[in-house]
């Protein structure tokens, strides 16, 4: 069974586990940014946030099977609107993918966002990650707009679904 736990940047173990997740799935960063994962990805995971958002609006989580962290996520509260929670990243180690963990993690995030009082979940998927696009669509997310960002190798597709 998948469990969710908050992570902190101050924890050496949390930082090491997040880096391990990135390094165990180098294809993800390669697909969406055209480079290899690095320690800067850990910094971005813990501190990256949209302009105008406070650090207090960002929460980072680890997903665990037993004592092993198998994935991580970050969620921004009240972004881009007051009734919405934004999933900045939902990511699992390659060896732990295709086991239902993504669906379970999304259900945990959905329940948390509902408890926080939000009505919608949004995220940005990158067109050069077809597996990710398929996952989000399978989970009921629909495209609401497309844009570009020089950081990413493909088109940025903003997706949304209601919180149920």
Model-derived regions: residue spans:
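Residues forming the Rossmann-fold NAD(P)(H) cofactor-binding site
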Residues: 103
């Amino acid at each position: 069974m998948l469990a969710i736990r908050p992570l902190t940047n101050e924890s050496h173990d949390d930082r090491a586990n997040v880096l391990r997740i990135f390094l165990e799935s180098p294809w993800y960063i390669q697909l969406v940014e055209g480079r290899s994962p690095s320690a800067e990805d850990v910094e971005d995971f813990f501190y990256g946030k949209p302009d105008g958002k406070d650090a207090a609006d960002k929460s980072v989580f680890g997903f665990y099977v037993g004592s092993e962290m198998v994935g991580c996520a970050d969620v921004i509260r009240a972004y881009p609107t007051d009734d919405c929670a934004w999933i900045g990243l939902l990511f699992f180690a390659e060896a732990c993918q295709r086991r239902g963990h993504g669906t379970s993690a999304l259900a945990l995030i959905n329940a948390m966002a509902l408890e926080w009082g939000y009505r919608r979940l949004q995220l940005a998927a990158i067109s050069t990650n077809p597996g990710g696009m398929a996952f989000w669509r399978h989970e009921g997310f629909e495209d609401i707009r497309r844009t570009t960002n020089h950081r990413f190798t493909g088109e940025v597709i903003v997706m949304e679904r209601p919180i149920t």
